[in-house]
Amino acid sequence: MTSTINRPLDGEGSVQVKQDPKINIEEGALVIAVYGKGGIGKSTTSSNLSAAFSKLGKKVLQIGCDPKHDSTFTLTHKMVPTVIDILEEVDFHSEELRPTDFMFEGFNGVMCVESGGPPAGTGCGGYVTGQTVKLLKEHHLLEDTDVVIFDVLGDVVCGGFAAPLQHANYCLIVTANDFDSIFAMNRIVSAIKAKAKNYKVRLGGVVANRSKDTDQIDKFNERTGLKTMAHFKDVDAIRRSRLKKCTIFEMEPTEDVIEVQNEYLSLAKNMLEKVEPLEGNPLKDREIFDLLGFD
């Protein structure tokens, strides 16, 4: 059994492994980690937000942190090889790789990387994320980047998949207006609060997704000190854009599509200019049940 007695704490009550400071992302880039309940639309949100930043003239890098490696396919219009798979091919001798082996250009110049992950039941997702950032630094691929977006697996907030929080300035939480999504969001708020003790990451806000209304999200925000930064209703064009393997900015400019595009552009502008770090105060599980009307 592995001992945890001598491990440095990484947030109260945590035995997460501290990130090597040598693989931090350079100061100057805006680094955003996108979290949320599994299947809530994080990859769609991340890719469209990356596209929006690029429309504002920013150099953008999106890093998919999911073994499914499907974060960036609406940007690249294909499934790209993962960093971990490519490293395995060269027996982890990263010096043998070229940037074109693992980094791919997508819509409007957005650069795309899929970190991938270890086989099911083995390894650690945090290690893979760390190796990805290390590889990007070794090839000097972060030096001229304005915005980095980490699109992170599900609502997992263990030491592994919480690793992107150690690089991020802000975390955006994608949620729907339902109990399960908000319950997952509360757990993520707890993880961010723990990470903020030792790292620069702060809560940037909430993205309401696939929801006509936001009344339950608003209740939660009011109790916990969060703020909704963008609201994307259940617009069919967003679903169809994913089926077409493209971003919302490549869809026919109908009234609904233009409205969604403008909301993404507004979110990107606010993250660049107006975002205020939030001091989130997570609720206990029972408090969420009571808040959202369960007996």
From Swiss-Prot:
Free-text comment on the cofactor: Binds 1 [4Fe-4S] cluster per dimer.
Binding annotation for ATP: 39-44, 68, 209-210
GO molecular function annotations of the record: 4 iron, 4 sulfur cluster binding; ATP binding; metal ion binding; oxidoreductase activity, acting on iron-sulfur proteins as donors; oxidoreductase activity, acting on the CH-CH group of donors, iron-sulfur protein as acceptor
CDD domains from the UniProt entry: Bchl-like (cd02032)
Reactions this protein catalyses: chlorophyllide a + oxidized 2[4Fe-4S]-[ferredoxin] + 2 ADP + 2 phosphate = protochlorophyllide a + reduced 2[4Fe-4S]-[ferredoxin] + 2 ATP + 2 H2O
Pathway(s) annotated for this protein in UniProt: Porphyrin-containing compound metabolism; chlorophyll biosynthesis (light-independent)
PROSITE patterns per the UniProt record, alphabetical: NIFH_FRXC_1, NIFH_FRXC_2, NIFH_FRXC_3
Iron recorded as keyword: yes
InterPro entries the record matches: NifH/chlL_CS, NifH/frxC, P-loop_NTPase, Protochlorophyllide_ATP-bd
Residues engaged in binding Mg(2+): 43
Source organism, top-level taxon: Bacteria
Binding site for [4Fe-4S] cluster: 124, 158
The UniProt record lists the keyword Protease: no
Keyword terms: 4Fe-4S, ATP-binding, Chlorophyll biosynthesis, Iron, Iron-sulfur, Magnesium, Metal-binding, Nucleotide-binding, Oxidoreductase, Photosynthesis
EC number(s) on file: 1.3.7.7
Enzyme class, UniProt record, top EC level: oxidoreductase
Cofactor(s) it depends on: [4Fe-4S] cluster
Function, as annotated: Component of the dark-operative protochlorophyllide reductase (DPOR) that uses Mg-ATP and reduced ferredoxin to reduce ring D of protochlorophyllide (Pchlide) to form chlorophyllide a (Chlide). This reaction is light-independent. The L component serves as a unique electron donor to the NB-component of the complex, and binds Mg-ATP.
Family membership noted in the UniProt record: Belongs to the NifH/BchL/ChlL family.
Assembly description: Homodimer. Protochlorophyllide reductase is composed of three subunits; ChlL, ChlN and ChlB.
Name the record gives this protein: Light-independent protochlorophyllide reductase iron-sulfur ATP-binding protein
Species this protein is from: Prochlorococcus marinus (strain MIT 9301)
Upper classification of the organism: Bacteria, Bacillati, Cyanobacteriota, Cyanophyceae, Synechococcales
Gene: chlL
